[in-house]
Amino acid sequence: MKKIQTSRADAKTVFDSIGSAMRNGRKHQNATNYAAMRDDVHQQLDEYDQRVKPISLENLVSLWPTRRTNMDEAKTAHDMYSTSKNEIKQIRAELETLNGGKVIKCPICELDYYAHLDHYIPREVMPEFSVHPKNLIPLCDYCNTKKSIDWLSHASRRRLIFNCAYDTPSGMMVLECRVKRILNDYPVCVVDYKSGLPANSAVSLECSTYHNLKLRPKYKAEVDNMLKTEMLRVMGEYVDNSNLFQSRLDFWNRKKNIYQSMMTIGTTVERLFNDALCNSPILDSWVVNNLLV
């Protein structure tokens, strides 16, 4: 997972721009609700901004139902977010400009391209932040769906999901990947947490994110496919160049040196892939025994 640049739009300006365009309809009194809650929501938006550096969003308390009883206003705040609104389109365009264009990789899994602006604090939980630009994070379909509304442990008041805009990554790989068996003539891996990880908040939050979004099985499936493709390529390369090496082991060790040089670069799944290639004795034995001239 990685850090992104977030929108610079002012939260109160966005809220007022959307709210001032609201009209009262037959079933809802949106304009009246906006006017009634405006000052309270402004205070909440200011408090959100004060809690991103350093990040302490877990200490926020929603206006509803703790401090307010009008749930019709909460629904109005919740429904202010819509991908069709110009203000949201502008935030999305800004995020794309700041983070590499429309083909932004999901900053959580780094596997798929982003498809949604996810509400880090779910609008079902705190609707007053439904259009806060700093609360909108570009995520892929998978991570957006898995995250759902479970962002906070109510028992410990600790956040469960890494905030790609304001959390600082631990700087280390908390996962490892090993080939554990050969199935149908192809290596099969296991992705697990590293042992002996330091007990600090950054590492704990990353582990919690992988767990709650169920990313380890997704990484495993991806690495298994990558290993299958790579093994076919390696076998073909040895057939074409076997005369350049002293032995099959010599060839494989040289390949591993290349993988080793790439273990600290690339996306999470690319690093797990190279980890499996370099640190799996079962794979070493299988490759050397199956290289053919």
Q: Residue ranges of each PLM-predicted region?
A:
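Short cysteine-rich loop/turn motifs with clustered Cys
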Residues: 93-116, 140
